[in-house]
């Protein structure tokens, strides 16, 4: 079993830096597109055998050191009572805007409401046995609430910000409910066999550090503290958090996910030796010639300066039009250049 990823999460020394990619099971792989051509995105998420198949593809094709469950962060939100569709981005036809809307939301039972997610994890633990660890994941409460209130993607998330400022009681009630749902969902993933959990707060960085601390931090902290994580490391990734790492760090967790807007060495200095880090190559680097990819991999590794507790990753998801051979070259570079 390749335990480099889990060892790095706990800050233990490893013989070479582990690497995986956010969205590594995805559209840039022809093998993924072959599966996806037979079903809709939601059908793929809700069919355990297919979700497991595409989860394993990048492990075999790229040689990454961890698999991450193929799913969507909004999967557990639908059974709360919202109608979800992808056209092509996520859209809720009945967004949450009032206290009455919040009161109608239910806390799903993961075993009953999203059994396909847990079944995919169980299949994957069998199929990945002796290979690499499996990462489960979920959206952070704030990012989930962004979609639930806005009803779709947004550039500025003005609707949820307006709720935060103008209807703080509605916002607090919603965040409380989403946090409880998230806790149940992620603990169910751990019970099913997920060996690490990544919490994605894709939109946490749209807030000022002051607003993040007031409106987001209490809920993410509650979520992380509520996970049964004695042997299950938690990676906390807040996109755009480079300017507020000391605040984000207060939420807890074992690994801080970093995007590419901060020097990895500077981030480690801010976070201190107790917290591992994950990141942080700019995803567009994978369009570059191999010599440039190698140079950039070397730069990120040099910024870490050999400190234990580094998982190499992109600073966000791999882009759909990246040549797969460039992703494979990057993984090989990380392994070759970090060999101890």
Curated annotation (Swiss-Prot):
One of its GO terms (biological process) is protoporphyrinogen IX biosynthetic process from glutamate. It catalyses: uroporphyrinogen III + 4 H(+) = coproporphyrinogen III + 4 CO2. GO terms for molecular function: uroporphyrinogen decarboxylase activity. The record marks 72 as: Transition state stabilizer. The keyword Endoplasmic reticulum does not apply. It holds the Pfam family URO-D. Keywords: Cytoplasm, Decarboxylase, Lyase, Porphyrin biosynthesis. It is an enzyme of class 4 (lyase). It is found in: Cytoplasm. The keyword Protein biosynthesis does not apply. Belongs to the uroporphyrinogen decarboxylase family. This is Uroporphyrinogen decarboxylase. It comes from Trichlorobacter lovleyi (strain ATCC BAA-1151 / DSM 17278 / SZ) (Geobacter lovleyi). The gene is hemE.
């Amino acid at each position: 079993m390749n335990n480099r990823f889990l060892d790095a999460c706990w800050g233990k020394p490893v013989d070479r830096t582990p690497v995986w990619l956010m969205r590594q099971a995805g559209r840039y792989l022809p093998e993924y597109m072959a599966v996806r051509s037979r079903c809709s995105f939601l059908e793929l998420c809700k069919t355990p055998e297919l979700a497991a198949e595409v989860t394993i593809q990048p492990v075999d094709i790229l040689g990454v050191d961890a698999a991450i469950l193929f799913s969507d962060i909004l999967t557990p939100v639908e059974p709360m009572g919202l109608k979800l569709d992808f056209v092509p981005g996520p859209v809720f036809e009945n967004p949450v805007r009032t206290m009455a809307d919040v009161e109608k939301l239910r806390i799903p039972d993961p075993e009953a409401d999203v059994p396909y997610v847990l079944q995919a994890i169980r299949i994957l633990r069998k199929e990945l046995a002796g290979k690499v660890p499996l990462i489960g994941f979920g959206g952070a409460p704030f990012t989930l609430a962004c979609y639930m209130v806005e009803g779709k993607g947004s550039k500025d998330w003005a609707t949820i910000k307006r709720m935060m400022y103008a209807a703080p009681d509605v916002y607090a009630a919603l965040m409380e409910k989403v946090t409880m749902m998230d806790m149940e969902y992620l603990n169910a993933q751990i019970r099913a066999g997920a060996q690490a959990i990544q919490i994605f707060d894709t939109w946490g960085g749209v807030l000022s550090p002051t607003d993040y601390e007031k409106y987001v931090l209490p809920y993410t902290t509650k979520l992380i503290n509520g996970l049964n994580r004695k042997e299950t490391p938690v990676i906390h990734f807040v996109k755009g958090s480079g300017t507020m790492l000391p605040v984000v760090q207060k939420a807890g967790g074992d690994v801080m996910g970093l995007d590419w807007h901060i020097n990895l060495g500077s981030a480690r200095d801010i976070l201190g030796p107790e917290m591992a880090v994950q990141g942080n190559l700019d995803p567009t680097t994978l369009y570059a010639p191999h010599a440039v990819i190698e140079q950039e991999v070397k730069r990120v590794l040099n910024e870490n300066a050999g400190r234990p507790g580094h998982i190499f990753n992109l600073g966000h998801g791999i882009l759909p039009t990246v040549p797969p051979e460039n992703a494979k070259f990057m993984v090989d570079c990380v392994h070759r250049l970090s060999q101890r």
